[in-house]
């Protein structure tokens, strides 16, 4: 009789994805973040579901319903802070996952990479709509500023903004539809994550050397299931430390004040994980140009497979490209810092230089470095 996991129609899918999956024998800890993103998604959907049971998406009661969750619901404060900090954790894992993909040349699996970019856009949309829901000062003004960017689109911009708002300003209709979007998007993300995995398992995982490893693959279980579990334990320890000791460390104090359309906060800024893109947006003096730069800061990732000039896949044995990669990482940290600063000298020029560096490294310097390395190796 055949083993059930190999014959049962449902178990067979799980078996091919998580048990008998042939995996390269040398993938490092940087490959753990895919499974950790899955954990983050499950965590966010489950905590979000319990929050949605008590939340009301009405401008008059949204803020007090969040207060009610924290004060009156059993462990409501824990669920709320797990959900809020879970978003930060999600983006930390997401950015490391993308960074690993760039470093080891995983973007050459074009379908998997493009679905990954789509997942990034959807996750950003989910985080943005979620940030509006507590209806604090930063929620309201963040929604006003970011949705207003669409008015830069020629001809249809203003109509588009009013269509999204459901009126002539950010109000009850906006909050209700943002809640609807925030609820449905994670399930779309979960479905797309399955497609992401499907395409990945068509080609098999990449590895640090960037060379085919078909001759020495090992089954996923027990080797990588155990390794992933270690990552899960470490991530949960970090997460619970953040939630239980520093729950408000990554939030904005302004969001503890109810939304007031008549009073603008001194510095309107998004959550920390969007600050790099916000800095790029602000570094362009023209509104439409800023919006294009903002979208391109993420969309530029889709060009990576076509900008790959090196004969080697991974950066492991390419010191010149490695230097540029870490310059890019440093540049992103710099942009994140600038995004949280007021628009005044010297921050303006630092942001503009960092933005130019960001696009230059990806679009010009890394392809050139690949060609130089080929030349040096006489390839």
From Swiss-Prot:
<dbReference type="Pfam" id="PF00033">
    <property type="entry name" value="Cytochrome_B"/>
</dbReference>
<keyword id="KW-0472">Membrane</keyword>
<keyword id="KW-0999">Mitochondrion inner membrane</keyword>
<dbReference type="GO" id="GO:0046872">
    <property type="term" value="F:metal ion binding"/>
</dbReference>
<feature type="binding site">
    <location>
        <position position="201"/>
    </location>
    <ligand>
        <name>a ubiquinone</name>
    </ligand>
</feature>
<feature type="transmembrane region" description="Helical">
    <location>
        <begin position="178"/>
        <end position="198"/>
    </location>
</feature>
<dbReference type="InterPro" id="IPR048259">
    <property type="entry name" value="Cytochrome_b_N_euk/bac"/>
</dbReference>
<feature type="transmembrane region" description="Helical">
    <location>
        <begin position="226"/>
        <end position="246"/>
    </location>
</feature>
<protein>
    <recommendedName>
        <fullName>Cytochrome b</fullName>
    </recommendedName>
</protein>
<dbReference type="Pfam" id="PF00032">
    <property type="entry name" value="Cytochrom_B_C"/>
</dbReference>
<keyword id="KW-0812">Transmembrane</keyword>
<keyword id="KW-0679">Respiratory chain</keyword>
<feature type="transmembrane region" description="Helical">
    <location>
        <begin position="77"/>
        <end position="98"/>
    </location>
</feature>
<dbReference type="InterPro" id="IPR005798">
    <property type="entry name" value="Cyt_b/b6_C"/>
</dbReference>
<dbReference type="GO" id="GO:0006122">
    <property type="term" value="P:mitochondrial electron transport, ubiquinol to cytochrome c"/>
</dbReference>
<comment type="function">
    <text>Component of the ubiquinol-cytochrome c reductase complex (complex III or cytochrome b-c1 complex) that is part of the mitochondrial respiratory chain. The b-c1 complex mediates electron transfer from ubiquinol to cytochrome c. Contributes to the generation of a proton gradient across the mitochondrial membrane that is then used for ATP synthesis.</text>
</comment>
<keyword id="KW-0249">Electron transport</keyword>
<dbReference type="GO" id="GO:0045275">
    <property type="term" value="C:respiratory chain complex III"/>
</dbReference>
<dbReference type="InterPro" id="IPR048260">
    <property type="entry name" value="Cytochrome_b_C_euk/bac"/>
</dbReference>
<dbReference type="InterPro" id="IPR030689">
    <property type="entry name" value="Cytochrome_b"/>
</dbReference>
<keyword id="KW-0408">Iron</keyword>
<keyword id="KW-0830">Ubiquinone</keyword>
<feature type="transmembrane region" description="Helical">
    <location>
        <begin position="288"/>
        <end position="308"/>
    </location>
</feature>
<dbReference type="GO" id="GO:0005743">
    <property type="term" value="C:mitochondrial inner membrane"/>
</dbReference>
<feature type="binding site" description="axial binding residue">
    <location>
        <position position="182"/>
    </location>
    <ligand>
        <name>heme b b562</name>
    </ligand>
</feature>
<dbReference type="InterPro" id="IPR016174">
    <property type="entry name" value="Di-haem_cyt_TM"/>
</dbReference>
<keyword id="KW-0349">Heme</keyword>
<feature type="binding site" description="axial binding residue">
    <location>
        <position position="97"/>
    </location>
    <ligand>
        <name>heme b b566</name>
    </ligand>
</feature>
<dbReference type="GO" id="GO:0008121">
    <property type="term" value="F:ubiquinol-cytochrome-c reductase activity"/>
</dbReference>
<feature type="transmembrane region" description="Helical">
    <location>
        <begin position="33"/>
        <end position="53"/>
    </location>
</feature>
<keyword id="KW-1133">Transmembrane helix</keyword>
<feature type="binding site" description="axial binding residue">
    <location>
        <position position="83"/>
    </location>
    <ligand>
        <name>heme b b562</name>
    </ligand>
</feature>
<comment type="similarity">
    <text>Belongs to the cytochrome b family.</text>
</comment>
<feature type="transmembrane region" description="Helical">
    <location>
        <begin position="347"/>
        <end position="367"/>
    </location>
</feature>
<dbReference type="InterPro" id="IPR027387">
    <property type="entry name" value="Cytb/b6-like_sf"/>
</dbReference>
<feature type="binding site" description="axial binding residue">
    <location>
        <position position="196"/>
    </location>
    <ligand>
        <name>heme b b566</name>
    </ligand>
</feature>
<feature type="transmembrane region" description="Helical">
    <location>
        <begin position="320"/>
        <end position="340"/>
    </location>
</feature>
<feature type="transmembrane region" description="Helical">
    <location>
        <begin position="113"/>
        <end position="133"/>
    </location>
</feature>
<dbReference type="InterPro" id="IPR036150">
    <property type="entry name" value="Cyt_b/b6_C_sf"/>
</dbReference>
<keyword id="KW-0813">Transport</keyword>
<keyword id="KW-0496">Mitochondrion</keyword>
<keyword id="KW-0479">Metal-binding</keyword>
